[in-house]
Design a protein with these regions (language model features):
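C-terminal catalytic lobe of FAD-dependent flavoproteins
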Residues: 204-228, 300-377
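Beta1-alpha1 glycine-rich phosphate/pyrophosphate-binding loop at the start
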Residues: 2-65, 141-164, 349
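Residue-level detector of alpha-helix initiation sites
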Residues: 10-11, 90-92, 110, 135, ...
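Mid-to-C-terminal Rossmann-like scaffold of FAD/NAD(P)H-dependent oxidoreductases
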Residues: 2, 253-345
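Conserved acidic residues
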Residues: 10, 70-75, 134, 188-189
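FAD-binding core/adjacent interface of flavoenzyme oxidoreductases
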Residues: 1-5, 30, 52-127, 197-203, ...
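Rossmann-like dinucleotide-binding cores of NAD(P)H-dependent redox enzymes
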Residues: 127, 136-190, 288-293
Length: 377
């Protein structure tokens, strides 16, 4: 019988299994993951919650095998009807300073449970130190503050995430932490202890230290299998490993040849759809304009497109004079990216405009009264 063995229970692995079920794949499907029941990762930093994609009954009903195991080696497919799909995701970067092991990470259900236990066991107002102010660090700092903690956020930059949000909005969002009672510090951590950190020559005491300084693709299994690895498992446009066409890679661990690695939820979903098409021998759905989101301090932040393609930016202010949207334009004036706060339907509208290489006027982009439907007309 044909088979698909998926290694990894994040969004990419689960989405692939669901696609295959919906398309009535005739073979066996199984998912192996050391953490057991597949669950969504973004809620970990947003709320410390573990949200399974589906109950165990869904897998039982559709004949999808669930194996709780840490796969460190396996046999490569021996038939063109059998597939191995690596959806192993990423692993947190270690804080490379003396005592760096004292910092907790926030990358798994076990991490979230451990951090929740510390927050819940302490007195109201306990001190929390967050190292790294990217997506995970900023979201967790907001979550910890809402739980009643005293939070200090250490960043190496005054504008974390400028490369994906645009410089202007990145600066505003980082500065906004102070408006919500979070102390921010720009600098480098040089040493950690069980309950303290040294940064910029000063000691910062804390009952909880969390490091969120980025992630790396989890390629240990791929390396063991002899697959080509270069900032992720290198794949073609059909998600096939360049080293073995019966091995696919999807999600954060995969990188299409000659392209940067995409590391967002939506990209993982699209990888899964492409992998299902490869396995089923059907036409793949068209890739959409990149999109991701983040939640902090009860604000919904969205980015569409790619700011690395922007030659210039245009900002739109709200009634209070704060930046609400940053639009990125290429050298020809075509819209290539945008980031926004509580943008509503604007994100969908901008995605459509980017896909069409639209060239809205500067006046339209700046005008807060120009809504999603009018933009680009």
């Amino acid at each position: 019988m044909p088979s698909v063995h998926i290694i990894g229970g994040g969004v990419a692995g689960y989405a692939l299994a669901r696609h295959l079920v919906q398309q009535q794949y005739a073979g066996s499907i199984k998912i192996s993951d050391a953490q057991g029941l597949p669950y969504d990762r973004p809620p970990l930093s947003k709320s410390l919650q573990v949200e399974p994609f589906a109950p165990v009954s869904w897998y039982q009903h559709h004949g999808v095998g669930l194996i709780q195991e840490d796969v460190q080696s396996l046999q490569l497919p021996q038939s063109a009807d059998d597939w191995v799909v690596l959806a192993t995701g990423t692993t947190p970067k270690a804080l490379d300073v003396p005592g760096g092991h004292h910092a907790l990470s926030l990358h798994s259900a076990a991490d979230a449970a451990r951090i929740s236990d510390v927050l819940e066991s302490g007195m109201f107002g306990q001190r929390v130190l967050v190292i790294g102010a990217g997506l995970v660090g900023a979201e967790f700092a907001s979550t910890a503050k809402m739980s009643g903690a005293q939070v200090t956020l250490i960043s190496s930059s005054d504008a974390p995430l400028a490369h994906v949000l645009g410089q202007e909005l990145a600066e505003q969002l980082h500065a906004d932490h102070a408006n919500h009672g979070i102390a921010t510090l720009t600098g480098a951590v040089t040493e950690l202890g069980p309950n303290y950190a040294l940064a910029n020559g000063q000691r910062h005491d804390a009952e909880l230290i969390v490091a969120a300084i980025g992630v790396e693709p989890e390629t240990a299994l791929a390396g063991h299998l002899g697959l080509e690895v270069d900032d992720g498992i290198v794949v073609d446009s059909q998600q096939r490993s360049l080293s073995n066409p019966q091995v696919l890679a999807i999600g954060d661990v995969a990188r299409e040849e000659n392209q940067p690695r995409a590391v967002h939820w939506e990209a993982a979903m699209e990888d899964a759809a492409q992998a299902a098409a490869t396995i089923m021998g059907t036409a793949a759905p068209k890739r959409s304009v990149p999109w991701f989101w983040s939640d902090r301090h009860e604000m919904h932040v969205e980015t569409v497109g790619d700011f690395s393609q922007a030659a210039s930016t245009v900002t739109r202010l709200n009634r209070r004079g704060k930046i609400q949207t940053v639009f990125g334009l290429d050298a020809k004036g075509s819209l290539v990216s945008a980031s926004m706060i509580d943008g509503g339907l604007m994100a969908k509208a901008v995605r459509r405009l980017i896909a069409k290489s639209a060239t809205p006027s500067i006046e339209q982009l700046k005008d807060p009264l120009t809504g999603p439907r009018e933009l680009g007309r």
